[in-house]
């Protein structure tokens, strides 16, 4: 499926297993889209046998999220399957996961403008890990 490249000074990054996708996820995606002039990249994450597997395999979750935003040029949906890229389970798989993310970034973003990435996370563990690797990370209050 063709996705136009995102263009802007900043791009939001939202990732999760989306098992299942719910209103809280949609609110985060809309916030990232609103706060970044270039829109946002949504990454559906998972691995073979993850928590969503019994009802919604990773591939199906990715397809649902991608179809939901198919007509939105400011939301670019991608997939990272930890098993397929050989990443160890969290918290040990960040290096391979980030390598895969960097590949996606180059495919999804018009990089000649050198936009900033702004990460949106709702889990303090992810926040702490990402703050060591990336500059702009927002920890969301999941109770709001």
Model-found features: residue ranges?
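Nucleotidyltransferase catalytic core that binds NTPs
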Residues: 1-144
């Amino acid at each position: 499926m063709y996705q136009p490249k995102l263009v802007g000074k900043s791009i939001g990054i939202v990732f999760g297993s989306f098992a299942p996708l719910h209103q809280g996820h949609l609110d985060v995606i809309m916030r990232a889209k609103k706060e970044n002039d270039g829109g946002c990249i949504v990454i559906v994450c998972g691995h073979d046998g993850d928590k969503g597997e019994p009802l919604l395999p990773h591939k199906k979750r990715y397809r649902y999220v991608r179809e939901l935003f198919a007509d939105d040029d400011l939301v670019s949906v991608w997939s990272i399957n930890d098993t397929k890229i050989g990443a160890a389970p969290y918290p040990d798989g960040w290096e391979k996961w980030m390598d895969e993310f960097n590949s996606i970034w180059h495919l999804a973003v018009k990089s000649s403008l050198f936009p900033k990435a702004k990460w949106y996370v709702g889990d303090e563990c992810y926040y702490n890990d990402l703050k060591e690797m990336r500059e702009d990370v927002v920890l969301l209050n999941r109770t709001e």
